[in-house]
Amino acid sequence: MKEKRIVVALGRNAFGETFPEQKKNVKKAAQAIADLVEQKYQIVITHSNGPQVGMIQTAMTEFARLDNDKNYTVAPMSLCGAMSEGYIGYDLQNAIRTELLDRGIFKPVSTIITQVRVDPFDKAFNHPTKVIGRVMTREEADAKDCLLYTSDA
């Protein structure tokens, strides 16, 4: 029988807010995904990274802000997104591989990092609903304009 392909979408709150919560929730997701593999499905997984990218961006910004020697700069959002995708994908890949091996299933598991394309003229930017990172004053934001990567502009 040919495997049917399905997409599993793990949403915003699927992983929790802390690393221990994420490890626990990733393990539960891996068990459910392995159940689907046992039912002969080919799985494609997509996931949110909102809370995680926000935590990374906040940490990187605060670290750069507190660095009196100015050895560190603020990481652009595109890199923070890649970092969060990378570590979430890494955790998922390892948990799924472990769960499959524990069940005697020898299938490859891999992670692909994606890029997000944002329309800078999207009207949603006029009324943001979710804060990512530290809230800045107008003066701080204006001073940071020169820090944008071309890919972030």
Language-model features: locations:
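Hydrophobic alpha-helical segments and helix pairs
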Residues: I112, V118-L148
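N-terminal glycine-/serine-/threonine-rich phosphate-binding loop
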Residues: M1-T46, I56-E62
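Alpha-helix boundary/interfacial micro-motifs
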Residues: K28-A30, A64-D67, V131-I132
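Glycine-rich nucleotide/cofactor/substrate-binding loop typically near the N-terminus or early
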Residues: V37, Y41-H127
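Glycine-rich loops and low-complexity Gly/Arg-rich segments
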Residues: Q31-A34, N68-Y72, V135-E139
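Conserved small/polar residues in nucleotide/adenosyl-binding loops
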Residues: Y149-A153
